[in-house]
């Protein structure tokens, strides 16, 4: 929410992680500086884009993923597997990974900048950030954009 609230950042919601990956690749090739931020379960949705487009053609941009942990009774069973195997999945895609520094913001920014030049995914550990509420004006804008996407506009 902090990034969405920031006036200097243009937030672009996507229907899926694979779509976000494709949009970011296009932006990168157009000379922009995209960042894709996803939940760990969404990394599986990006697999084909990563292995058939980004990696073979050398397209790089920062990808940040949470590391969602599995809890007994979780409604989505894939979280159990990803809770223990996320680094292996990243390596299987031909990427490296590192854990985003949650103690030193300058180091975290350097890690993100470095992942813009390499096939590296930054893993964000649970509770790395403070909770930030989304500003009301952005809540309405996101609702409008989501509605337009659903209607095919």
Residue locations for each model-derived region?
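Thiamine diphosphate
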Residues: 1-153
């Amino acid at each position: 929410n902090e990034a969405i609230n920031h006036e200097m950042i243009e937030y672009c919601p996507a229907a899926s992680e694979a779509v976000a990956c494709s949009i970011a690749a296009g932006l990168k090739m157009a000379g922009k500086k995209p960042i894709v931020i996803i939940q760990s379960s969404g990394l599986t949705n990006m697999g084909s884009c990563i292995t058939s487009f980004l990696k073979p053609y050398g397209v790089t941009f920062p990808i940040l993923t949470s590391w969602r942990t599995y809890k007994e009774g979780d409604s989505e069973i894939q979280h159990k597997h990803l809770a223990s195997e996320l680094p292996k999945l990243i390596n299987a895609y031909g990427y490296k990974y590192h854990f985003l520094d949650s103690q030193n913001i300058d180091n975290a920014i350097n890690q993100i900048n470095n992942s813009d030049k390499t096939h590296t995914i930054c893993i964000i550990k649970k509770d790395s950030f403070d909770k930030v509420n989304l500003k009301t004006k952005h809540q309405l804008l996101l609702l409008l954009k989501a509605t337009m996407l659903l209607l095919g506009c």
